[in-house]
Amino acid sequence: MDPNTVSSFQVDCFLWHVRKRFADQELGDAPFLDRLRRDQKSLRGRGNTLGLDIETATRAGKQIVERILEEESDEALKMPASRYLTDMTLEEMSRDWFMLMPKQKVAGSLCIKMDQAIMDKTIILKANFSVIFDRLETLILLRAFTEEGAIVGEISPLPSLPGHTGEDVKNAIDVLIGGLEWNDNTVRVSETIQRFAWRNSDEDGRLPLPPNQKRKMARTIESEV
């Protein structure tokens, strides 16, 4: 069993115990109490799956938390602020663009648009988004540009469906790349997106071959066989 899985469960059990003590003093509001009940059911399920006793795990979690607090300074207790990262200029973000052969897909709370008329181009993906804990927090806008600067694709949050995860954004990027590569375009992803929003790397930390290169390699292998 992964030690991180065990220690995470232990800490969650102890933190639930602290929240329960807080609620016992009639200090919690309705949403707090509702989350407490839901998390209790979740912990029981995780305990059964892991084969761990909740009371024993709570004691172990207390030791972990106490050890962390002993090493913690008041400065470290501050909530980290979000950072806003920008690949695009204000002009690139606000520029209107048009599609000759429009294709649009909604994935969760994200809208993916691309121009299917674009072929045999080198395309770069750029994005503006906020980051917290070194992970994407909120996507503001992602756009696909040709080397000439024309906009040929876009991923944007839907105002009517707020809220998206880093995994949602990564999946949307995969859809956009797949659609653009279908017409033999070469798609590159900015370093900022690779680092925070699209951590699609193999075991050696290298970005994998894009789908069109994989298809070309497969055809080459088949012809050799």
From Swiss-Prot:
Q: Where are the stretches annotated Disordered?
A: 204-225
- Provide the alphabetized UniProt keywords: Eukaryotic host gene expression shutoff by virus, Host cytoplasm, Host gene expression shutoff by virus, Host mRNA suppression by virus, Host nucleus, Host-virus interaction, Inhibition of host innate immune response by virus, Inhibition of host interferon signaling pathway by virus, Inhibition of host PKR by virus, Inhibition of host pre-mRNA processing by virus, Inhibition of host RIG-I by virus, Inhibition of host RLR pathway by virus, Interferon antiviral system evasion, RNA-binding, Ubl conjugation, Viral immunoevasion
> For the region PABPN1-binding, what residue ranges are annotated?
218-225
Quote the PTM field: Upon interferon induction, ISGylated via host HERC5; this results in the impairment of NS1 interaction with RNA targets due to its inability to form homodimers and to interact with host EIF2AK2/PKR.
Q: Which domain of life is it from?
A: Viruses
Sequence motif Nuclear localization signal, residues: 34-38
Where can the motif Nuclear export signal be found?
A: 132-141
Chain segments carrying region CPSF4-binding: 175-210
Provide the residue span(s) of the region labelled RNA-binding and homodimerization.
1-73
State if Oxidoreductase is listed as a keyword: no
Q: Does the keyword Lyase apply?
A: no
GO cellular component: a single term: host cell nucleus
| One GO MF term | protein serine/threonine kinase inhibitor activity
Gene3D superfamilies documented for this protein? Influenza virus non-structural protein, effector domain (3.30.420.330), S15/NS1, RNA-binding (1.10.287.10)
Pfam families per the record? Answer: Flu_NS1
Q: What does the record list as GO biological process?
A: symbiont-mediated suppression of host cytoplasmic pattern recognition receptor signaling pathway via inhibition of RIG-I activity; symbiont-mediated suppression of host gene expression; symbiont-mediated suppression of host mRNA processing; symbiont-mediated suppression of host PKR/eIFalpha signaling; symbiont-mediated suppression of host type I interferon-mediated signaling pathway
UniProt-annotated location(s): Host nucleus; Host cytoplasm
Instruction: Name the predominant localization.
Output: host cell
Oligomeric state and partners? Answer: Homodimer. Interacts with host TRIM25 (via coiled coil); this interaction specifically inhibits TRIM25 multimerization and TRIM25-mediated RIGI CARD ubiquitination. Interacts with human EIF2AK2/PKR, CPSF4, IVNS1ABP and PABPN1.
State the similarity comment: Belongs to the influenza A viruses NS1 family.
Free-text note regarding domains: The dsRNA-binding region is required for suppression of RNA silencing.
Tell me, in a sentence or two, what this protein's role is.
Inhibits post-transcriptional processing of cellular pre-mRNA, by binding and inhibiting two cellular proteins that are required for the 3'-end processing of cellular pre-mRNAs: the 30 kDa cleavage and polyadenylation specificity factor/CPSF4 and the poly(A)-binding protein 2/PABPN1. In turn, unprocessed 3' end pre-mRNAs accumulate in the host nucleus and are no longer exported to the cytoplasm. Cellular protein synthesis is thereby shut off very early after virus infection.
Q: What is this protein called?
A: Non-structural protein 1
Please report the organism this UniProt entry assigns to the protein.
Answer: Influenza A virus (strain A/Chicken/Shantou/4231/2003 H5N1 genotype V)
